[in-house]
């Protein structure tokens, strides 16, 4: 499967997404390029598959009005902070207490990478079982994660305060991050961490649409460094954007993202909670994979799922997967383990069920394609249940 980047026209016009180069670094295989629709305020983004020129993209609509700030031109990103309810044009990308003199402190962090490009991430299912299969500490770990998830959650409704990006643009970005994860065989936890970093950053900072992919790429770069045994090189992440951004820009954005997040990288995710629940629930591999599929679908929609804590979204994914395959919603042992009753989970469960029903008709299909494979028991091919036996 070929990965795709957001490749704008020469002159860095803002809001186009196209597939990455077919030639170049070893990690990506030659193949068809995918040209996506223009990132505008419209909600419709249609895929067009086919061979196209490496520099061809559709025409932009009023792209000259997008770069409204020049104060941070050396970084190549235009951000205003803090985000306020009344959207204003970005004038700088400064933190509230000080100027980010990134030019003075940026280092070439990619030159010393330990990535062995011939090796891929270790099998994550076995790794998670080894890490989490500690019954004597399971409750303590869960209690600690429940405390941390409140601290490291994005702000609900943050997208309404973004003056230049929309929910649809974020959906396209997350869909692309899924493809990047598959191309480089990244762990599922890496994807969940990257989306957490992205949402927390956007909760605090306002970003122009043409730089949204730069933030997303920096987020997955950081998540890979944190989670992977052999993270891809920085040059690989530059490449997957079709060289839309330079290595220097990516490293500067990485540093900016770290500062905004106060270097708090250990954030509980839906994936972590779900792995705990599946170990406690003793369900079959197919049910586990369906729950993973549903939890990844929840990453696409910032609303409504950002309003739910990761532990609750994980519980909803478990319930829906368990009922779809086994006819049972929420077992008593997980109620005792989590403290969540079914009544508490129902609002999130209903939203997730609605998302599952419409998944096949979405323009973004990276998650569906991922879970069609035998590795995941083909769970995205399963028909969703029409209704749930909710009180």
From Swiss-Prot:
Subunit structure: Interacts with the CDK1 and the CDK2 protein kinases to form a serine/threonine kinase holoenzyme complex. The cyclin subunit imparts substrate specificity to the complex.
UniProt function note: May be involved in the control of the cell cycle at the G1/S (start) and G2/M (mitosis) transitions.
Main localization category: nucleus
Keyword Zinc: no
BP GO annotations: cell division
PANTHER family xref list: CYCLINS
Compartments where located: Nucleus
Name of protein: Cyclin-A1
Keywords tagged on the record: Cell cycle, Cell division, Cyclin, Mitosis, Nucleus
CC per GO annotation: nucleus
InterPro entries noted in UniProt: Cyclin, Cyclin-like_dom, Cyclin-like_sf, Cyclin_C-dom, Cyclin_N, Cyclins_cyclin-box
Protein's UniProt keywords contain Nucleus: yes
Annotated family: Belongs to the cyclin family. Cyclin AB subfamily.
């Amino acid at each position: 499967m070929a990965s795709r980047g957001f490749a704008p026209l020469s002159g860095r016009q803002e809001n186009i997404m196209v597939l990455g180069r077919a030639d170049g670094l070893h990690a990506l295989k030659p193949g068809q390029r995918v040209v996506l629709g223009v990132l505008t305020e419209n909600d419709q983004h249609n895929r067009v598959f086919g061979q196209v020129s490496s520099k061809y993209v559709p025409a932009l609509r009023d792209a000259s009005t997008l770069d409204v700030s020049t104060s941070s031109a050396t970084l190549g990103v235009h951000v205003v902070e803090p985000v306020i309810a009344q959207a204003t044009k970005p004038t700088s990308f400064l933190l509230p207490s000080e100027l980010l003199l990134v030019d003075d402190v940026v280092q070439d962090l990619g030159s010393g990478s330990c990535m062995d490009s011939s090796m891929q991430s270790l099998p994550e299912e076995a790794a998670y079982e080894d890490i989490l299969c500690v019954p004597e500490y399971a409750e303590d770990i869960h209690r600690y994660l429940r405390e941390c998830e409140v601290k490291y959650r994005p702000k609900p409704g943050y997208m309404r305060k973004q003056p230049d990006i929309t929910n649809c643009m974020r959906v396209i970005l997350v869909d692309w991050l899924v493809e990047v994860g598959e191309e480089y065989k990244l762990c599922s936890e890496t994807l969940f961490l990257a989306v957490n970093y992205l949402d927390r950053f956007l909760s605090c900072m306002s970003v122009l649409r043409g730089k949204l992919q730069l933030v997303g790429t920096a987020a997955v770069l950081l998540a890979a460094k944190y989670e992977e045994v052999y993270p891809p090189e920085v040059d690989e992440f530059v490449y997957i954007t079709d060289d839309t951004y330079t290595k220097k820009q990516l490293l500067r954005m990485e540093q900016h993202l770290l500062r905004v997040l106060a270097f708090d990288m250990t954030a509980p995710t839906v994936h972590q909670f779900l792995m705990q629940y599946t170990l406690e629930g003793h369900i079959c591999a197919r049910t586990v994979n369906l729950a993973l599929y549903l939890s990844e679908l929840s990453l696409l929609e910032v609303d409504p799922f950002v309003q739910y804590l990761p532990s609750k979204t994980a519980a909803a994914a478990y319930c829906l997967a368990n009922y779809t395959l086994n006819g049972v919603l929420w077992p008593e042992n997980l109620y005792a383990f989590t403290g969540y009753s079914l009544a508490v989970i129902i609002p999130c469960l209903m939203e997730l069920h609605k998302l599952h029903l419409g998944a096949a008709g979405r323009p973004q299909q990276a998650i569906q394609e991922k879970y069609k494979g035998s590795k995941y028991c083909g769970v995205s091919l399963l028909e969703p249940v029409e209704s749930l036996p909710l009180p």
